[in-house]
């Protein structure tokens, strides 16, 4: 069975939220903070986020096994976030495929065209940082949130 990538709909929201909760457990453990937004986001908030921007899901058969979402702001910055891959499928290139797919969407979107892609992750999230740098992202800033977490912002031209 192969993995297919398609646009997410409101009907996918519950599956995405469950996957998000599963995937962000390791991030919460890494930073010692289980109150992070991906673990506290409500279903209604997720549905609104999907409606406001663009979201993709990857399916293995009928199962949602990965997702990413984002939106383009008024300056032409495509803010990409919550790139998640089911733990059993991590390390097989699915995250990179999803990142490529959402970048392609924003580069040709009928709305405001993306001039740049921006995303962020925690400073200890080595796998995320490796993926983003391999995909051409460069660090453009850091912000210390608390003693355990510094957020790294990465960007690349569209």
Residue ranges, per PLM feature:
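Conserved beta-strand-loop-alpha-helix junction that forms the acyl-donor binding cleft
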Residues: 118-129, 145-149
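Acetyl-CoA-dependent GNAT
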Residues: 10-13, 17-88, 96-111, 123, ...
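Short, low-complexity, intrinsically disordered N-terminal peptides in bacterial proteins
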Residues: 1-4, 158
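Short acidic/polar active-site loop segments enriched in Thr and Asp
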Residues: 115, 138
């Amino acid at each position: 069975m192969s993995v297919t990538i398609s646009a997410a709909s409101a009907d996918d929201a519950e599956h995405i939220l469950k996957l998000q909760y599963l995937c962000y457990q390791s991030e919460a453990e890494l930073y010692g903070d289980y109150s992070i937004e991906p673990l506290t986001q409500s279903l209604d908030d997720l549905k609104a986020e999907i409606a406001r921007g663009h979201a993709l899901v990857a399916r293995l058969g009928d199962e949602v096994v990965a997702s990413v979402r984002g939106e383009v702001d008024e300056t032409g910055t495509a803010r990409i976030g919550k790139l998640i891959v089911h733990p059993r499928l991590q390390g097989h290139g699915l995250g990179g495929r999803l990142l490529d797919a959402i970048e392609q969407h924003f580069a040709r979107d009928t709305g405001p065209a993306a001039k740049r892609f921006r995303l962020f992750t925690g400073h200890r999230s080595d796998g995320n940082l490796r993926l983003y740098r391999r995909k051409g992202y460069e660090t453009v800033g850091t912000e210390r949130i608390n003693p355990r977490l510094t957020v790294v912002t990465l960007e690349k031209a569209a």
